[in-house]
Amino acid sequence: MRIVIYSMLVLLIAIQYPLWLGKGGWLKVYEMERQVELQEAKNSLLALRNAKLSGDVKDLKDGTRAIEERACVEHGLIKEGEFFVQILPADKSSDTQVTKQ
């Protein structure tokens, strides 16, 4: 009788091995689910960035206002008689910059 019990126990362990540690076992499935969650989080951040860039591209294609704003902010270009006021966040500097040309 003991031989039957021990052989059944060995067979039970042999059957459980692929379920837990095999190629498609629970541990691999759990790890893959975690990787999918991380990738979905990255994808959502990239989707937000893409939406912002898409809006920038649309603004640059449709009107000159976005081009003027970029020229002013990034390169300091302003028109004759125009004022450019840039308010910086408090953590960087509390001063305001005013330039007149």
UniProtKB/Swiss-Prot annotation:
Regions crossing the membrane: 4-21
Domain of life: Bacteria
Keywords attached to this entry: Cell cycle, Cell division, Cell inner membrane, Cell membrane, Coiled coil, Membrane, Transmembrane, Transmembrane helix
InterPro entries named in the record: Cell_div_FtsB, FtsL/DivIC
Intervals, Periplasmic compartment: 22-101
Cytoplasmic side: 1-3
GO biological process: FtsZ-dependent cytokinesis
Membrane topology note: Single-pass type II membrane protein
Coiled coil regions, renumbered to chain: 33-53
Quaternary structure and interacting proteins, as annotated: Part of a complex composed of FtsB, FtsL and FtsQ.
Family from the record: Belongs to the FtsB family.
Protein name per the record: Cell division protein FtsB
